[in-house]
Structures are given as structure tokens and as C-alpha cells.
Design a protein with these regions (language model features):
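N-terminal subdomain of lithium-sensitive/metallo-dependent phosphomonoesterases centered on the IMPase/IPPase/PAP
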Residues: 1-82, 143, 147, 174, ...
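General beta-strand structural signal in soluble alpha/beta enzymes
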Residues: 53-57, 81-83, 92-94, 113-114, ...
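Short acidic, glycine/serine/threonine-rich loops at helix termini
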Residues: 65-67, 94-96, 114-117, 168-174, ...
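A generic local secondary-structure boundary/capping motif
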Residues: 70-71, 89-93, 145-150, 170, ...
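DPxDG-like acidic metal-binding loop motif
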Residues: 77-87, 91-111
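Acidic beta-strand-loop-alpha-helix segment within the catalytic core
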Residues: 102, 107-182, 245-248, 275-282, ...
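Gly/Ser/Thr-rich active-site loops/lids in small-molecule metabolic enzymes
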Residues: 178-188, 201-203, 208, 212-243, ...
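A two-mode feature
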Residues: 236-277
Length: 320
């Protein structure tokens, strides 16, 4: 993909964040999500790609826009797109930290077509890459990652969703002496954060959404991190969907290269609320300021865009 597309993709996630961020703290998660979807879909109209949504808002009968299989873009190279217009709709509704607008783009056929079900994951940044094995205990993984990173176990920070299903993992990590940062929603954001030195996130573990696992893998692919995962179908219907998506063995350990099947990936995310890495949207009379990360796997480049937007210039977000 042309590297100049990186800025175009940044504008897409900025549009989603700017539109939905107006509903911060107002308890309207569905309305915020709708605004983000509308803005993202509109912004795609000016991007010079022929894109197909592979991971999006749901099946064609579940979502009016950005549904799986929808074609977007103004024409150009064929790409597959993974989007989450808002990761953390509850976070926006409650005015809490960690909400982002996020997308990733790969050459055609570049993504695992992850079904909408649970996925067990373990993620690390570049310094921990190669040290994880999802078939081993959390204790072994923490110890191996700590050794690879040159840290003591009690200096390792793990992020996991605050869910009852993770209580056993929490106890195991704490008994070992590792530190846990619990989050209420959204595991793409911390996976992105563990890629960057100084974010304070070293590992992301636990079970979350499978589509989010692919987006997390995109960030890790771009920045040199690592992930292992396993799908966790809950019934026969979900097993059937795994088979339809090309996953014949639902117990298969999925590596980074299984989730992201190309070296040509661009990842972009804009903060809506504050994170460990990105600053929140700041609105002011006549405009706003956003903080965006854009990563490209071919070069390993990570860019942070601190951007001022003027309302009178942003009527349509069409190419200028």
C-alpha cells in the first residue's frame, strides 16, 4: 500500500472520534456508536482504496453501515479493512478512560476472518516477543516475559478485563507478584499500548472478543510485538461459524502470522477519552484537538499526530 494512505486512514479514525466524542458522559452509548459509524463511513468515501470490510459492525442484517462484506472507498488498490468505530462505547457513555476509534488495513486476504465470539489472548510488545506460549500457565508466561525484557516479575504490568472469568488469572498473577491493571472494556487499546516503551503496559492477557483480537494483532504486527490466541466457541453454531471462516480446528493456537497474514498493514487509532498512550479529544469554540497513532508494518514506523481541527473546514471531510 502507498504510504501516503496512512494520513488518509488517520483522518477516518479522527472523524469517528470527533463526531462521537460530543456525547462523552451522557449515557448514550448506542447514539455515540451511531455517530462514529456515520462519520467513519462518510470519511471512507474520499479515501483512494477499493476496500472490503472484513471485521466491522456485524453481518449485513445486523448493521446498516460498515457491515462485513461492505465495499468502501473512492477506488484504488484492493484492501481488506478491520474497523471498530468505537472501542469502548460504555466508556464514552460513562465518561471513563480508554475509548478509541480504531481501524486497520491490510492487502487483500490479509486478515483472519474472525467470527464474533470469544478469543483467549496473550499479547506482548517488541521486547517480550517470542517469549509467550498460550499453552503454558500464566505463571510461566509472566516469568518468561520478565526474563526476556530484563525485568523482575514484580515489575511486570498486566492488563486484563475485569471479568469473573478472569478471577483465577488475577489470583495467579498476584500470587506470583506481578501487577494487574483491570479495565472495564476494550482490549485493543492496551494491546496497542504494550507496543510502545513508556506506556506502562507489558502484557495483555485474558478472554475478549475475537474481532478485537485481530485488531490487536494488527497493532502488534506493525510495532514488532507478539500475540498468541485461541478461539473459544460457546456452542455448535459458533463452531460451525469457525469452520466457515476457515478455522478447521477450533483448538488451534493462532499466532501473529495466523491472525495477520501479510506484512503490509497500516493501523490507526484516535483517542476519544484518555489512555496510557494517547491524550483525549479536547474541544474548544470552533474546533477540537485530537491525538492519533498511525503504524505501518512495512517500515515499523510509529507516528503520533497531534492535530488541530477547525469546524468551518470540516464540513464534509472530502479530499482536498
Amino acid at each position: 500500500m502507498d504510504r501516503t494512505l496512512s494520513l488518509e486512514f488517520a483522518r477516518v479514525v479522527e472523524a469517528a472520534a470527533l463526531r462521537s466524542g460530543r456525547l462523552l458522559g451522557r449515557g448514550q452509548k448506542d447514539e455515540a456508536d451511531g455517530l462514529a459509524v456515520d462519520a467513519m463511513r462518510q470519511a471512507f468515501d474520499s479515501v483512494r482504496i477499493s476496500g472490503t470490510v472484513v471485521i466491522g459492525e456485524g453481518e449485513i442484517d445486523e448493521a446498516p453501515m460498515l457491515y462485513i462484506g461492505e465495499h468502501v472507498g473512492a477506488g484504488g488498490p484492493e484492501v481488506d479493512i478491520a474497523v471498530d468505530p468505537i472501542e469502548g462505547t460504555n466508556l464514552i457513555a460513562k465518561g471513563q478512560n480508554g475509548a478509541i476509534a480504531v481501524m486497520a488495513i491490510a492487502e487483500k486476504g490479509g486478515w483472519l476472518h474472525a467470527p464474533d465470539m470469544y478469543m483467549e489472548k496473550i499479547c506482548v510488545g517488541p521486547r517480550g516477543a517470542g517469549a509467550i506460549d498460550i499453552t503454558k500457565s500464566l505463571t510461566e508466561n509472566i516469568q518468561n516475559v520478565a526474563a526476556k525484557m530484563g525485568r523482575k516479575v514484580d515489575e511486570i504490568n498486566l492488563v486484563m478485563l475485569d471479568r469473573e472469568r478472569h478471577y483465577g488469572l488475577m489470583k495467579e498473577a498476584r500470587d506470583l507478584g506481578a501487577r494487574i491493571m483491570l479495565i472495564s472494556d476494550g482490549d485493543v487499546n492496551p494491546a496497542m499500548e504494550c507496543c510502545i516503551e513508556g506506556s506502562g503496559v507489558h502484557m495483555v492477557v485474558g478472554t475478549g472478543g475475537a474481532p478485537e483480537g485481530v485488531l490487536a494483532a494488527a497493532a502488534l504486527k506493525c510495532a514488532g510485538g507478539d500475540i498468541q490466541a485461541r478461539l473459544k466457541p460457546g456452542n455448535e453454531e459458533e463452531i460451525r461459524r469457525c469452520h466457515e471462516m476457515g478455522v478447521k480446528d477450533v483448538n488451534q493456537v493462532l499466532t501473529l502470522d495466523d491472525l495477520v497474514r501479510t506484512d503490509d498493514v497500516i493501523f490507526a487509532a484516535t483517542a476519544i477519552t484518555r489512555g496510557n498512550l494517547l491524550n483525549p479529544i479536547q474541544y474548544f469554540p470552533g474546533g477540537a484537538r485530537t491525538h492519533t497513532i498511525v503504524m505501518r508494518s512495512k517500515t515499523g514506523t510509529v507516528r503520533f499526530l497531534d492535530t488541530i481541527h477547525r469546524d468551518e473546514k470540516l464540513t464534509t471531510l472530502k479530499a482536498r
